[in-house]
Amino acid sequence: MEKKIWYAPNGFEAYGDEEINAVNRCLREGWLAGNGKYTTQFENEVASYFGKKHGLFVNSGSSACLLALASLNLPSGSEVITPACTFSTTVAPIIQLGYKPVFCDVELNTYVASAESVISKITPATRAIMLPNLIGNTPDWKLIRKMLDDTSRTDIYLIEDSADTMVCTPQTDISTTSFYASHVITACGSGGMVMFNEPKYLKRATMFRDWGRIGDNTELVVERFNHSVDEIKYDYKFLYACLGYNFKSSEVNAVFGVEQMKKLPKFVSIRRQNVERYLENLKDVKGIVLPSDTKNSNWLAFPIQVEDRLSLVNYLEDRNVQTRVIFSGNITRHPAYREYLQVFPNADTIMRNGILLGCHHGMTIADVDTVCRFIKEFLNLDISRVQE
């Protein structure tokens, strides 16, 4: 049987003794609840990598997206522009917070929205643009920022959902990312971060993350009891200003992430080599749509499109190559989002034909060559044989 080629890093492909030793050190030090020195270090390092001043470590990228929007305190019914080809928890917070998603299509080969398609959706009710760096490819944030600035609409925020990758995007107002186990780096299998330049948005996001409370981590009684409720002096660690959540993560997750950040350049380099190998191997193969690669992309996985997707999926999976579809395709066709149903030609094509293949840092060039060999074999076969 062929070696299993996973869609995402599996087991010790993702971590090693460095992370294990760091976690053990953290456990021996005895502080688990988060907001400790490792959380602070991790927040600072990731925020700096993204070109932001402040980071807030949370339990998932999905939570980070919700906090990104919640921190802005937009008027009810505000419109938020977002692509139809996406991930569910890029869109869900828009609706959960009482806003209206306004969908646009994506480009067929990049899987992200063009600047023109985004800006064309702006109306007087638009208050935010929330775009994913889908599969690790990035929209043209510089052009989007320029075109937005040209509209003189200073009341529209740019939010990037960078769950799938790690990039520097100073053009955006808010960035989010995810440290789920399958991503470019992981914080012990989970975690996320929301990043800001403005302290006021960080403060509000922190309140939402920490149960809605006003207080921070100080133990100074003079600060804790410097608030009153109906003339009752009250500890602001238990004084609630908004309807919050518990989206906190732990020091164990943070220290794991700190070690992963040291490996990020290596992980990115391996992924880049694997993507370039795919592109070289498949460039002359008919019947397959390859992604447009800008060299700035830091791909989570390698996307392709073929007309008979299910047959190719079966062919690859039967040969121990794990596959995925390209996330939502057109998310307005999904049961939870049917009230927004629209035809988006490119997102619909991706929904029918899209496949994700592994390109992660646990894979070798030989693994990529094996996957490409199977794809070529499949495309040279009579389809009826594959479906038997």
What are these regions (language model features)?
Residues 1-33, 241, 358:
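N-terminal "arm"/small-domain region of PLP-dependent enzymes with the aminotransferase-like
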Residues 32-79, 93-97, 103-105:
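Phosphate-binding glycine-rich loop
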Residues 85-91:
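Conserved coil-to-alpha-helix start sites within the AMP-binding
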Residues 100-110, 324:
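Short beta-strand->loop structural element characteristic of the AMP-binding/adenylate-forming
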Residues 109-187, 193-201, 356:
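Active-site phosphate-binding strand-loop segment of PLP-dependent enzymes
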